Regions:
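Single conserved hydrophobic/aromatic residue that forms the stacking wall/gate
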Residues: 1-14
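P-loop potassium selectivity filter motif centered on the GYG triad
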Residues: 6, 33-98, 164-215
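Juxtamembrane inter-helical linkers in multi-pass membrane proteins
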Residues: 15-18, 22-25, 58-63, 106-137, ...
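Alpha-helical transmembrane segments and their helix-start/interface "positive-inside/aromatic belt" motifs
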Residues: 16-31, 143-152
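Membrane-helix interfacial "entry" motifs
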Residues: 18, 22, 46-47, 77, ...
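Membrane-helix cytosolic exit motif
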Residues: 94-95, 103-106, 215-232
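Transmembrane alpha-helix/helix-exit interface in multi-pass inner-membrane proteins
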Residues: 96-122, 159-164, 168, 176
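Extended C-terminal subregions enriched in glycine
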Residues: 147-164
Length: 234
């Protein structure tokens, strides 16, 4: 919303908004994935215009976690489905009402990964992770990595729990857990754009509901309810 506020204004404000590193990451991911999916699904839709239209709408919907779909991407080639699957983790920018891990966390995790690889070859060199022009302290990087670990662990645990019903394959269960934690909307196959979650039993629906709440609250508030030490008065 901060970026939206700066975009509504003079030409100088628009130029300032473009300087936002998070916005550049967001647009970069959107354009790159849209172009890649367009090429993958081009044989399926015949013309570049049609392929681009379907690809851009689905990518925008997934990244903004709006939940709309104009095509059943469960029927797209594997490469396109893999890209959609990865987008479900990402979400939109920090401060937005969208779900997902958020662009800022993805960017910092990427930069931390690059720094770790470089440190392997240059152990004596001091390397600082920078985001939005400022150095990011190691405490924040550890917290970001911890959030990512909990995020992925919750998805995997949720997928395993709902798999005990034995109704759907691994792709359906994993995408169902992921789309609930990220609050995306549709998943793949039976829970894809042409389907819904009605086929799951009561137990799975409770698990998926808890995953949705956890994702909407950014995980930790829900986990705090399971941590008895926080219940006591200090």
């Amino acid at each position: 919303y901060d970026i939206h506020e700066r975009l509504v204004g003079s030409e100088m404000c628009i130029r300032d908004s473009v300087k936002s590193e998070e916005l550049r990451w967001y647009l970069g991911i959107f354009l790159t994935v849209t172009a890649a999916i367009t090429m993958v699904i081009l044989p399926q839709y015949g013309t570049v215009g049609n392929a681009l239209r379907y690809a851009s709408f689905q990518v925008a919907s997934i990244m903004s976690t709006t939940g709309y779909a104009t095509a059943d991407f469960s029927l797209w080639p594997v490469a396109a489905r893999m890209l959609i699957f990865m987008l479900m983790f990402i979400g939109a920018c920090a401060g937005s009402t969208a779900g997902g891990m958020k662009i800022c966390r993805i960017a910092m995790l990427w930069k931390q990964g690059v720094r770790s690889v470089r440190h392997t070859f240059q152990p004596r060199k001091v390397q600082v992770v920078r985001f939005e022009g400022k150095g990011v302290d190691d405490t924040l990087l550890r917290e970001t990595a911890s959030f990512a670990f909990v995020y992925i662990a919750m998805i995997l645990i949720g997928a395993v729990l709902i798999a005990f019903e034995g109704k759907y394959d691994i792709e359906t269960n994993l995408s169902a857990a992921l789309t609930c934690v990220s609050n995306v909307g549709p998943g793949f196959n039976a829970v894809g754009p042409a389907g819904n979650f009605a086929g799951y039993g009561s137990f799975a629906k409770v698990v998926l509901s808890l995953l949705m709440l956890a994702g909407r609250l950014e995980l930790y508030p829900m986990l705090a309810l399971l941590y008895p030490a926080l219940w006591r008065k200090q």
